[in-house]
């Protein structure tokens, strides 16, 4: 893999200098980098890249950072004994705050 990267850089350097100077060289070097990076990461299907949509990434970050309003508990995936213990503690806390627990 490293050999193919070095070989690609070398051919870009020689081909770029022979056909049009530094600007052509830089254009050749950097125009294919995203495609090569995606293919080396296994993100291509032969017809283009998969999952490289920046809007989807931004939406994922926004959804992951949403925080529920104060006083509203998020849905829990716990079950069984853990859920029962959580409910008991939550109910005891509410009763304590409401002042319905007698000492």
From Swiss-Prot:
It is found in: Virion. Keywords: Capsid protein, Viral genome ejection through host cell envelope, Viral penetration into host cytoplasm, Virion, Virus entry into host cell. One of its GO terms (biological process) is symbiont entry into host cell. GO terms for cellular component: viral capsid. Pfam families: Microvir_H (PF04687). InterPro entries: Microvir_H (IPR006777). Its main location: virion. It comes from the Viruses. The virion is composed of 60 copies each of the F, G, and J proteins, and 12 copies of the H protein. There are 12 spikes which are each composed of 5 G and one H proteins. Minor spike component of the viral shell. Involved in the ejection of the phage DNA in the host and is injected with the DNA in the periplasmic space of the host. Involved in the determination of the phage host-range. This is Minor spike protein. It comes from Escherichia phage St-1 (Bacteriophage St-1).
């Amino acid at each position: 893999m490293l050999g193919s990267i070095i070989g690609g850089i070398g051919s870009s350097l020689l081909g770029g200098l022979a056909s049009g100077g530094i600007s052509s060289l830089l254009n050749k070097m950097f125009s294919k980098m995203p495609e090569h990076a995606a293919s080396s990461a296994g993100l291509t299907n032969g017809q283009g890249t998969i999952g490289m949509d920046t809007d989807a990434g931004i939406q994922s970050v926004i959804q992951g950072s949403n925080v529920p309003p104060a006083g509203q508990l998020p849905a829990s995936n716990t079950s069984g004994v853990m859920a029962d213990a959580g409910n008991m503690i939550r109910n005891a806390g509410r009763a304590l705050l409401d002042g319905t627990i007698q000492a």
